Amino acid sequence: MLQQILHDMYIDPELLAELSDVQKHILFYKMREEQLRRWKERETWEALAQDEGLRPPKTKRASDKHIQWLLGADGEVWVWIMGEGPGDKPYEEISEELIAERARLQAQREAEELWRQKEAEITKKFRDALANEKARILAEKWKVEMEDRKAAKVLEERIHEEFKRKEEEERKRGEEQIRLQEEQRAKELYWTLKQAQLHCQASEKEEREWEEQLRRSKAADEERSRRAQRARDEYRHHSLRAIQKGTVAGLSSMFRELGQSHEQEARLYHHLPDPGLPQPLALPVRTWERPLRPVSRDVIVRWFKEEQLPRRAGFERNTKFIAPWFHGIISREDAEALLENMTEGAFLVRVSEKIWGYTLSYRLQKGFKHFLVDASGDFYSFLGVDPNRHATLTDLVDFHKEEIITVSGGELLQEPCGQRDSPPDYHLLFE
């Protein structure tokens, strides 16, 4: 389009109206430049024509326009010498006008050059201002993120202190309840023994019945002591699990359940039949009791099948296929060997042997990084790195394909590292 305008030295007024001021200045500059080029070309040919008798070349236009020389009465080209004809200006005046025109054109070129310099300065000024504004926005964003993390840490510490306080209160209530039960039972045994002493003169049959009654009472006491000890152990175990999970709701629910179990035990204790006929309580049997930490590979496999398979850990989203980044129980060295020949950003997720969760192994430009993923609760999150919690393991991986794991490292999950051997290293988990 620009070449066509410069060729015709004409632009449609509607098109000109749509141009900005800067574009109009540029177009004007280009058209003047083209005029000067043609003028200089013509001057060169005129000089050659004077020296060698040549004529300027005809410019072929797209519209097939041409020039026809005016002929005089003698049939030759009609010639008019400027300044010598009737009514012409003197040569000196014409020369002055040409000099003035050249001076005007030179001043115009200098003005255009100054405008280009000014335009470059304006562009650089606004480009620098835009860069500074972007830097300021990034700095403010980083500051807000740091403040959010500090607030989250303070909240976590406050929740932890609340856990400890509630645990101590519940422990005191449990100990007080056991103490009251022991005192009440001691009174009952005292009166039982007292009555037995009063009837010591009874017959031999009554003596045997009394001994049998005493034996059963002691057995009932031992059974109640064992139940109390089991309740304390179960309370301690659930307290540790609640702290590991990091949820107030889980601990509160456990407190309510423990309180209900203590109340139920107290009600059963008050409604026990005669000590001569003790009835043992039937305690529920749990099929899977997870240890505090993994103790063997068999326990890890069972944990994965019991708790992680129902949550679709290791599967792609909304499919029955196992994710390419998922691996089984492999060591740190095996993970680094798999990532050795891959580029920065490659990663895999393997089942951890240290915690109830996983380890995300990440390939750096030089070396590797390993991040622990906690899966002991109802969510998945990095330990000590990222406070974000995710409903599934796939959600965590997809989230960090777009968001970095740490601000200092800038780790972004890019290329999953798949299986190299057959059968795959996770086959024991899905058998």
UniProtKB/Swiss-Prot annotation:
InterPro entries: SH2 (IPR000980), SH2_dom_sf (IPR036860), SH2D4B_SH2 (IPR035839). PROSITE patterns: SH2. Gene3D superfamilies: SH2 domain. Residues 325-417 form the SH2 domain. It comes from the Eukaryota. Pfam families: SH2. One of its GO terms (cellular component) is cytoplasm. Keywords: SH2 domain. Residues 211-234 are annotated as: Disordered. This is SH2 domain-containing protein 4B. It comes from Homo sapiens (Human). The gene is SH2D4B.
